[in-house]
Amino acid sequence: MAQSLSEAGISTFLVPDSSIYAIMSRVSKVILGAHAIIANGGMFAVTGSLLAATAAQAHSTPVVVCAGQFKITPLWNLYQDHSALDFSDPSSVLGFEEGTLVDKVDVINPYYDYVRPDLVHAYITNE
């Protein structure tokens, strides 16, 4: 999304998760994508979205979500094969070359965050 926005002439930059709160005071708007938008106004998005939305709320920065209309759903089942409980490959967080450390920790790498409806200011869809 950042590349598309940048190509359209919109000033865009990507920030590592660890720096989101520190940079938020200089941000005018947070734009997120969504995996699914549920009936209560909340959404599921890639991990890090909740952190960005929470930091934005603390700095009174609006959060805008861009998603196709097909991602709006009245129901959401957390216990299906593909759900908000999906996990990414643990090696993307902690490489297996870390030998002794890998044997001593369990790495849980969730793929989605649930972003509460009170953290989102507007949804933009294709219709």
Model region roles, listed by residue range:
Residues 1-127:
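Conserved phosphate- and dinucleotide-binding cores of soluble alpha/beta proteins
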